[in-house]
Regions:
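Sequence/structural signature of beta-propeller domains
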Residues: 24-217, 227, 589, 605-818
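Bacterial Sec-dependent N-terminal signal peptides
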Residues: 8, 21-25
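Short helix-loop boundary/capping segments at the starts of domains
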Residues: 14, 75, 79, 108-111, ...
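Phosphate-group recognition and catalysis centered on beta-loop-alpha active-site segments
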Residues: 206, 212-613, 633
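Bacterial N-terminal signal peptides that target proteins for export
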Residues: 1-10
């Protein structure tokens, strides 16, 4: 019995050794390398990559596009190949300036018989959407060609159909994208149905049909539009503070959490605008309106760029007491003069300081200046004589203002429109000094000595609605008042004049694009209560320019049409994009109904909001009703096409939420009907695997899949090509190891010479890259493999020098036929 067991053991050992030898005997037959720092013509890219340099590579890439990140390959049958980079730099936030392209390359493989081992780039074409097939906002939204970028799609796979058109698998949706042979989009992207949850879709966190992924897309389009017109100031994103994705369950929009009966609204998450994501994309985040110290401190901790507050006194106190570096000493956001450092936080007095003085009046602005705000936030209307005047509303509101002649002015329905009166008429007939915001709001002229002095001592004038020009004049007057005038002896004089001489302005254009009726003012159409958006923006901007305030004044709006005008005609002025959800209810008589600002579509006027200049906002489609089952970078990574060219089999890179976390899915897509069949196949990871890199079919039922871990430069890592066999739909594919990519024989030393400290070069060749995303089938004994070099981030080969990985294209001769 002992001898029998020993004999069996010996046989098993010999078999195991033979298998290892077979794997190690897979042989490097050819290798070609495209240097990491290879570039093609194109606009500057990599502007959001962060610290410079990265792995020795200077960034950004001025007036050029890197040829890198190959994630799909096609054999043209003539010694050339088409290779497809992915989205560029790995994230939606940092890839808006990376053009989606397909490059035409020709490798001259180094083999035992010779060859240079180089790759020539012969040309490229770009993916583009001139026919506007894509329904959501893209970076080049406002161009004719609409070239697609890595912030629009993360394409990871590519197949050519029988008709010569191209199909791309995307991770952001995940989507299938269909183009002609030149890269022009032919139809809207195809969603992936969630067959486990009928009526739902499989969505990733970057899906543009969820609100959560839309803010950055809109800001990208806004910035690109600005740059087209010479405005190189990054626009500001200004979301409502209760709609920040901050993980605070106590901040939400009431009518999102519990829509009133009769409102016609759907419930939705309020966790929409992610501060870190927006900032990573290159946009300052200034939130409104925050009026308690605890919340201010919370937002400072979240590294917000700016806070707008009705309580300028509390805001200064919160900033002054903030200990950013936790060393026990507050004041980290103050400069040497004790003033707020705007580079660290922009503290804005909302409508001056509306909880301290009547809003949008000079006393309110004086309060904001007294409390050392870095910015005075305000709103403008346009009078009948074309003058910008400070007002949040198109009417002279009865709640805020009274008539100077004593005639009662209480009926909201009878309120006068600003556009129907001249400045002189408004300032002669109305005073806006009513108190309704609580006990901290006061209108005693003694509290506003600078304003009284500005009006020559006539306290009866201080609560007129001032013009924008008067605001600029007042700030200059205030500076002099405390520097050399009556206030120069005040204990705060130095801080006040120093702050006032540099204070900024954030001026809102109060325009409403809706064409339905304002229920508070029967017979009035929202859009007709003010002048048109273009002259509105022009008149505000002209005052800024005439005062030389282009570096100190921003123009903000919920109506993005006005901001596009500013970018086009006044490129020295920075724009601020306001986001909020103040819906008009189906029954506007229900308490809380508002004017539709600025996400809500207008009833009967199409599915999109009229506020965002045609950019798409997926109103109230959030993770509450459409959760994210696909992971970030977990969408379509590999995609096979059947030999008859009838079906695609896109394969998810990572498991879905709610599924077994070692299993990923292939979905079958019928090209004739352009629809998913519902057939799915399961693929199970090796215990070491975390992602797949590519998937192709070699015949009707067999294929190759690259599977990997996340290591780089590690010869003990896991990088493998598996041969798979499809079974019946719904079952696991059978898999067996075809190539261990870290154990390839190089008896002819094709891979040499390398650089000092290179990993995996020489007789024992390896492909030690983080991501390996391309596999080609040549014949039963030969396959091709390419890495995705993640330029300039990954260092898997050149560990010794620390230089970024090159693109490598290898041909492997298999020890055993497929």
């Amino acid at each position: 019995m002992y001898m029998k067991i020993r004999s069996v053991f010996s046989c098993l050992l010999i078999s195991a050794v033979s298998m290892l030898a077979a794997r190690a005997a897979d042989q490097l037959e050819g290798r070609a390398v495209l240097p990491a720092a290879t570039f093609a013509q194109g606009p500057t890219s990599g502007q959001q990559l962060g610290p410079n340099p990265i792995n020795g590579q200077p960034v950004p890439f001025l007036n050029k596009q890197p040829v890198q990140g190959f994630s799909a390959v096609q054999d043209n049958g003539d010694g050339t190949f088409n290779v497809m980079p992915d989205n560029g730099f790995g994230a939606l936030e940092n890839s808006a300036d990376f053009h989606l392209r397909v490059y035409h390359i020709q490798p001259d493989f180094k083999t035992k018989d010779g060859g240079s081992g180089t790759i020539s780039v012969l040309g490229f074409f770009e993916l583009r959407d001139p026919d506007k097939r894509i329904p959501f906002t893209i970076t080049e939204q406002f161009t004719d060609e609409r070239i697609l970028t890595g912030a629009d799609f993360d394409i990871e796979s590519m197949q050519r159909a029988a008709d010569g058109t191209l199909w791309f698998g995307d991770e952001f949706g995940p989507f299938l994208l269909h183009t002609d042979a030149s890269g022009k989009v032919l139809e809207a992207p195809f969603h992936l149905p969630d067959f486990d949850n009928p009526g739902k879709e499989i969505r990733a966190p970057q899906n543009p049909f969820n609100e959560e992924a839309t803010t950055v897309r809109i800001m990208n389009a806004a910035r690109h539009h600005a740059r087209l017109h010479g405005n190189n100031k990054a626009p500001v994103c200004s979301p409502w503070e209760v709609m920040l994705d901050d993980g605070n369950a106590n901040t939400f929009v009431d009518n999102r959490q519990a829509p009133p009966v009769g409102s016609g609204l759907a419930p939705a998450s309020s966790e929409i605008h992610n501060i870190a994501s927006i900032q990573a994309a290159g946009y300052p985040v200034v939130t409104y309106t925050v009026d308690n110290t605890a919340r201010m401190t919370e937002l400072l901790t979240l590294k917000i760029n700016g806070i707008i507050s009705d309580r300028s006194d509390l805001l200064y106190g919160a900033v002054a007491s903030y200990d950013a570096n936790a060393d026990g000493t507050p004041g980290d956001y103050l400069d040497a003069d004790g003033l707020i450092d705007i580079a660290k936080i922009d503290a804005q007095g909302h409508r001056g300081s509306r909880d301290l003085r009547p809003e949008n009046t000079l006393p309110a602005m004086e309060a904001g200046l007294d409390n050392l705000m870095t910015t005075l936030e305000t709103d403008c209307g346009i009078t009948s004589d074309g003058i910008p005047i400070l007002s949040h509303d198109p009417h002279i509101q009865a709640q805020k203002c009274s008539r100077t002649d004593g005639v009662p002015y209480e009926d909201v329905a009878a309120e006068v429109l600003i556009k129907d009166l001249t400045v002189a008429e408004i300032q002669e007939q109305f005073r806006c000094d009513k108190l309704f915001r609580g006990p901290t709001q006061q209108n005693d002229p003694a509290l506003s000595p600078v304003t009284v002095d500005f009006f020559g001592g006539d306290a009866s004038q201080i609560y007129v609605l001032p013009t924008l020009q008067q605001l600029f004049d007042f700030v200059t007057f205030y500076t002099t008042y405390y520097r050399t005038g009556p206030g120069s002896g005040h204990p705060m004089a130095t801080k006040r004049w120093k702050n006032a001489q540099r204070v900024r302005f954030n001026v809102e254009t109060k325009v409403n694009p809706r064409t339905d009726e304002d229920p508070l003012h029967p017979g009035q159409i929202f859009a007709l209560r003010t002048i048109e958006p273009t002259p509105f923006a022009q008149k505000v901007a002209n005052v800024i320019v005439s005062n030389g305030m282009q570096e100190r004044a921003d123009i903000q709006s919920f109506d993005f049409r006005t901001l596009l005008v500013v970018q086009e005609q006044f490129p020295q002025i920075r724009t601020v994009y306001l986001f909020g959800d103040f819906p008009k209810f189906d029954d506007p008589a229900i308490a809380g109904s508002d004017d539709g600002t600025n996400m809500q579509p207008q009833a009967g006027a199409g599915p999109n909001t009229p506020w965002m200049a045609g950019m798409f906002w997926p109103y109230r489609s959030t993770k509450l009703t459409q959760p994210f089952r696909a992971q970030t970078s977990g969408g379509f990574e590999g995609m096979a096409i059947t030999p008859d060219k009838h079906r695609l089999l896109p394969l998810l890179e990572k498991p879905l939420a709610g599924d077994d976390q070692r299993t990923i899915l292939m979905h079958e897509f019928d090209l004739a009907s352009s629809s998913y069949t519902g057939n799915r196949f399961k693929y199970q990871f090796d215990p070491r695997g975390v992602s797949i890199g590519d998937f192709i079919l070699t015949d009707e039922e067999h294929g190759l899949i690259i599977e990997r871990d996340n290591t780089q430069g590690n010869l003990n890592g896991f990088k493998a090509v598996y041969k798979i066999t499809l079974g019946a739909p719904g079952t696991f594919v059978n898999k067996e190891l075809a190539v261990d990519l870290l154990r390839i024989s190089d008896p002819h030393r094709i891979s040499e010479p390398g650089q000092p400290g290179d990993v995996g070069i020489g007789r024992n060749f390896a492909f030690p890259f983080t991501t390996i995303e391309d596999v080609l089938f040549f014949d039963q004994k030969h396959i091709g493999v390419l890495n995705d070099n993640n330029f300039p981030f990954s260092v898997g080969r050149h560990v010794g020098s620390g230089q970024p990985d090159d693109e490598e294209f290898i041909i492997i001769k298999l020890d055993r036929p497929l």
